[in-house]
Amino acid sequence: MNPRTDLLENVLIQSLAASRLDASGRQNLSSAELNELFKAFTYPLEAGGKRVRPNLTCLVARACGAPAEHPALLVCAAAVEYIHTYSLVHDDLPCMDDDDLRRGKPTSHKVFGEAQALLIGDALLTQAFSLLADAAEHGLRPDAALRCVQILSRSAGPYGMIAGQWKDLAHTGNAAAADWQTLCAIHNLKTGALLSAACAVGVLAGTALSEHSAKVYQDPRGVDEILKAAEELGMTIGLAFQIVDDVLDATKNSQQLGKTAGKDGDQDKLTAVRLLGTAGAAQEAERLTAAALEKLENLKQLTAGRQAAASSYNSDTAAAWQMLTEFITQLLVRTS
């Protein structure tokens, strides 16, 4: 869905490789230990996946005027993916979802051990903010980098993604006592928060890296308005994405999903299928998909209007909006 995913993959691995090289000069870790750590830390990244969040960051940024292959943009997108991957490694642990399969491969704790998987997740989360701290070296304005740190840390922190997981655990094994409002709150926190941040980081990077930034985004209130629209888009995508996930978990097998199917039902988790039935959940996913595309159109109107006024709306920008529309549509009507 994104023709330049290979560039992102390179940044994901190269960042950890650079950290390994830096650590090699400190004489506290042997070459064998460094290689072992590097293998462990890159394992969940190399498993692949949809790369939904970093692709959203890149596509939103391009729609806001950023060059497609700008190093600072790729660094920001990689930071988003590190945070997401860390959350998956921790979610799969026996004390959480206790899953053996992720992205079609054995989960990290099955390969390296439970305690080691905990450390792998910790390492990826820490590395994400190390990347953002260095983003200015790649051409991102320091104020934009700082705001990216603020948004990502809040979305992934105690009152964002972590709160969602906490709330999810509280209702696991007690799903009958919960309702639709509770489910939406879990999905908004656990999934929507980081997707919202991914879109917001795209706006911040895109507006900062655009060659027409001074003309298009000179009014700070304008950027804030675009930022809010992007966050609303990400939150709506998150809820739709998770409901689609609930339907797929109930209707597909493990090979089709690349992860263990039927786990939600086995663990008595609160899901859209449990509350609405398979058909009802599918209808709700369709409604939210349409709502997400409306949110995207709102974001486009806010941004493209400013770009047109500054004569910076061109064929590249138009293509980026089209790619973003296609990406979101394919994401929310997926079958695996």
Task: Specify the residue positions occupied by each region the protein language model found.
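All-alpha prenyltransferase/terpene-synthase fold signal
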Residues: 1-336
